[in-house]
Amino acid sequence: MPILRLLFASLVLSLIVPHSAIALEESAMVKMLKQVDDRQKNNGDYKSLVYIERKERDKETVVFEVAVYRRDEKDKLMILFLKPKAEAGKGYLRLNKNLFMYDPTVGRWERRTERERIGGTDSRRKDFDQSRLAEEFTPAYAGEEKLGRFEAYRLKLKVKPGVDVAYPVIHMWLDKKTGNVLKFQEEALSGRLMRTTYYPKWNRLYSESKGEYVYFPKQINIYDEVEKGNSTLIVMRKVDLNSLPENIFTKAWLESKSR
């Protein structure tokens, strides 16, 4: 009889424990990360016209316009500054997992790290590139939370050994309904919070080369957690999934845009 009562109590307890207390298996979390990556990846090329607004405490707001080019199958990325005039022709090129910056005023290329502030803003290379979460991070379950009107999974991502990223730890909020990323909080190795990023709007575009929709954040809001009061707004104004010229991802091509 005591055994029956114990079994009954265990059954009742399992029914009243909230679903949020049930941790996700690592395989399920990896699958979620792969889905995020796959939905943002295009089998062909990718081009976007991007508006960037940089706000710094006690300084005037600065607005940039850049063109972003991607060839996801070959891990290639180019960021070309179009406006303002003083920045036009400046650019970044990622080849073989190395990031280079070109300054047309001196005609020189310099290698940059993943911590590079793109154009001096709060953005990083990864904010414009394809998502590689499953490839670069190992997930751990941190629970379920309400984020505004959204029900979200919260995961803690730690960088895998030997992988070069801007920040080694990311706290990630993933919309349970849509699978879209809602929020990132990025930490230094010391545990210090460095950036908070929100993704309030997502969009999608059908890709002929992929045969599926490609998802992209329509808007990104980045807040500097070290220099309080500094923030960056990124808006994807136009996305094109048609093929790009074969030689576009070269230093010579980018240099030609400043002549």
Can you name each region flagged by the protein language model?
Residues 19-23:
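Signal peptide processing junction and immediate N-terminal pro/mature segment
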Residues 7-18:
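Bacterial N-terminal signal peptides
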Residues 132, 150-251:
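Gly/Pro-enriched, hydrophobic low-complexity segments
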Residues 24-45, 51-52, 60-62, 85-86, ...:
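Flexible, processing/modification-adjacent segments and terminal tails
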Residues 79-85:
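N-terminal post-signal-peptidase region of extra-cytosolic proteins
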Residues 1-5:
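Positively charged n-region of N-terminal signal peptides that target proteins for export
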Residues 68-69, 140-146, 200-207:
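Short amphipathic beta-strand and strand-loop transition segments with alternating hydrophobic
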Residues 44-78:
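N-terminal, post-signal-peptide region of Sec/Tat-exported proteins
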